[in-house]
Swiss-Prot record:
Family: Belongs to the venom protein 11 family. 02 (wap-2) subfamily.
Modification after translation, per record: Contains 5 disulfide bonds.
WAP domain: residues covered: 31-76
Name this protein carries in UniProt: U20-lycotoxin-Ls1a
Organism: Lycosa singoriensis
Keywords of this entry: Antibiotic, Antimicrobial, Disulfide bond, Secreted, Signal, Toxin
Amino acid sequence: MFSTSDQVSKMNSRILSALLILGIATCVIAGGFCPKSRHPQCNLSYKINDCCAQSDCRVGSVCCVEGCGNVCRAESDTPLGEKFVDGSECKHGHVFPKKWYQFW
């Protein structure tokens, strides 16, 4: 037969396992926020995209939309900037605006 201490031990290990899984899931989902944009306005006639997905950035960084293109920035605790949405239209590198004759 099981003693009361064995039952308590099993219950404690289940609770700790559940808390561990919850903690890991929270870290994976949290993702972080973009800090305030350094350059909200861009004086260039083109953009330079360093990232086109969150996976393009290192751990602890987030792909953020800036005035002159998307860049990887260190995560912030507060949502002050604009985070790039995975799946949005994006092209890596220098992106020039279309000329009038390229729209057709």
